[in-house]
From Swiss-Prot:
It comes from Methanosphaera stadtmanae (strain ATCC 43021 / DSM 3091 / JCM 11832 / MCB-3). Disulfide bonds: none annotated. It comes from the Archaea. Its cofactor is Mn(2+). InterPro entries: Adenine_deam (IPR006679), Adenine_deam_C (IPR026912), Amidohydro-rel (IPR006680), Metal-dep_hydrolase_composite (IPR011059), Metal_Hydrolase (IPR032466). This is Adenine deaminase. The keyword Hydrolase applies. HAMAP family: Adenine_deamin (MF_01518). Keywords: Hydrolase, Manganese. Belongs to the metallo-dependent hydrolases superfamily. Adenine deaminase family.
Length: 542
């Protein structure tokens, strides 16, 4: 078959009219022709780092939207569902991905659980990593989140890194604010990428060490404008909500990059040839021998996708998608008893005391990095009381894996004036996490999730809404628009409750991730990521 148009060459930074001859899904030859065409043909877009589960969609439902935006391949790290269901969860992602023309490549989850300091539903051993990396659809070792384990030469993680080297597959990193000697130790073991950088200085140091840097432009962390001139290597999503995906994927990132001043040819390379070469994919350029994964766009400013071709087959054209997802539902149970309000109380050490100084988590918008601070709170009826007026709320993590333990603390930055929000999406172990103004609301929100087998929920003095996520408590089998509409209604309720965070449930979901600085809440209590130690909630009572 022949495909004609204005061809963009990622090697020479030129566009010329030509025809592409395709046989058996592979580009056979390219010939320049003397003709006038309207659209530009570019290589299919590749998202080099994404967790599909964060979209709350199954792989096939995700593909229904991503393909419309010119995404033809993704490098997916399934460590979210792996933390909940182990290999059963990974197999589910692979099986559902096969139902779509979108090319799914996977990374083997290296840190399940993310650290030894939290409880998850499964453990991914070196033997499992060996099995996964021996398979062609697994193209790398997934982000090595427990960088402290690497730095301290812990046996299990080094064994996983050794296995990746055996199969000559790259090792993805996760090194927020890692610097100096510790960064050099991390890189020395073979970790080659990072998507956690937030400053040009951080990027520069990692680049000097030979790392390849991914600019993260997702729903919560948006670094594209800040790092656009930092000589980065890829643009990635990492975590993307369904409502954001509907409005654009890598096509939207390209529009932003050009608006911020990046050369469009360079921007396109960050989502085509660069990830293809790094992960050894037969894609990324329009050249002989490569897969015929092509995207027709209107121009190099708007990047409006007109047509998508994968393996020579048209998948999307004239605003019509030529495939339909049919995900398989799976039954998931949260192995936790219904809670009582008193389960969320933090008791004073001495009931005679009137006040307590507590350590707490400080949350900021559009970043998953938190800060540790302290505040003085009153003690009433032997219980430490939050200060809603000062935006100091209660935060709890509920063990969903049969332990029936609840750890309680305090958080500042959510702004909720009455009610509670709860989620079974809680990186990376995905226990239930809940923030609220009092224990009664927190118990009601948590029990609502337990009864619904997972999801997101908000309860105030006026309303109750949810997004049900029956697949591992992480994903829905419903279409993206349904999930996005339900999510939008839920976020509107949370906004009416006083929360000013742009993505409250995304922010909430990262409050229990003990590999991103500075302090996080786990099933075992408040954890300082920098010192790698648990912290007492109560500093002092009087």
């Amino acid at each position: 078959m022949l495909i004609k148009g204005n061809i963009l060459n990622v090697f020479t930074d030129e566009i010329y009219p030509g025809e592409i001859k395709i046989e058996h899904g592979i580009i056979e030859s390219i010939k320049e022709v003397n003709a006038d065409f309207n659209d530009i043909i570019v290589p299919g877009f590749i998202d080099a780092h994404i967790h599909i589960e964060s979209s709350m969609l199954t792989p096939s439902r995700f593909a229904e939207i991503a393909l419309r935006h010119g995404t033809t391949s993704v490098i997916a790290d399934p460590h979210e569902i792996a933390n909940v269901m182990g290999m059963d969860g990974i197999d589910y992602m692979i099986d559902d991905a096969k139902k779509t023309p979108l090319k799914y490549y996977f990374t083997a989850p290296s840190c399940v659980p993310a650290t030894k300091f939290e409880k998850s539903g499964a453990t991914i051993s070196p033997n499992i990593i060996d099995n996964l990396l021996s398979r062609p659809e697994f193209v790398a070792l997934g982000e090595v989140m427990d960088y402290n384990a690497v730095i301290s030469n812990e046996k299990s993680i080094l064994e996983k890194i050794k296995i990746a080297k055996k199969y000559h597959k790259p090792i993805d990193g996760h090194a927020p604010l890692l610097s100096g000697k510790n960064l050099q130790k991390y890189v020395k073991h073979g970790v080659i990428t990072d998507h956690e950088s937030t400053t040009k200085k951080e990027v520069a140091e990692k680049k000097r060490m030979g790392m390849k840097i991914m600019i993260r432009e997702g729903s919560e962390s948006k670094m594209l404008e800040k790092l656009i001139y930092s000589n980065c290597d890829f643009i990635v999503s990492d975590d993307l909500k369904p409502e954001d995906l509907i409005n654009g994927h890598l096509d939207k990132c390209l529009r932003k990059a050009v608006d911020y001043g990046m050369d469009p040819y360079e921007a396109i390379k960050l989502v085509t040839i660069n990830p293809a070469e790094h992960y050894n994919l037969n894609a990324g350029s329009i050249s002989p021998g490569k897969s015929a994964d092509l995207v027709f766009i209107d121009n190099l400013r708007d990047f409006t996708v007109k047509r998508v071709v994968i393996n020579g087959n048209t998948i999307f054209k004239k605003q019509k998608l030529l495939f339909r997802a049919n995900p398989r539902p799976i039954d998931t149970t949260l192995h936790v008893s219904l809670t009582k309000p008193e389960d969320f109380d933090l008791k004073a050490q001495n009931p005679a005391h009137k006040s307590a100084t507590v350590n707490l988590i400080n949350v900021s918008d559009n970043t998953i990095i938190t800060k540790q601070s302290s505040a003085k709170l009153s003690i009433q009826k032997k219980t430490i009381i939050p200060s809603v007026f000062e935006d100091i709320l209660k935060i709890s993590v509920v063990d969903r894996y049969g332990g029936n333990t609840i750890s309680n603390g305090f958080v500042k930055g959510f702004g909720i004036k009455n009610g509670a929000i709860a989620s079974s999406v809680s990186h990376d172990s995905h226990n239930i996490i809940v923030v609220g103004t009092n224990s009664e609301y927190m118990s009601r929100a948590t029990n609502h999730l337990i009864e619904n087998k997972g999801g997101l929920a908000a309860i105030s003095n006026q309303a109750k809404l949810d997004v049900t996520l029956p697949i591992a408590g992480l994903m829905s089998d419903k279409p993206a628009k349904v999930v996005a509409n339900n999510s939008a209604k839920l976020n509107e309720l949370v906004s009416n409750m006083g929360c000013e965070l742009s993505s409250p449930f995304t922010s909430l979901s990262f409050m229990a991730l003990p590999v991103v600085p500075e302090v996080k809440m786990t099933t075992n209590g408040l954890f300082n990521v920098n010192t790698h130690q648990f912290i007492d909630i109560i500093k002092e009572e009087k």
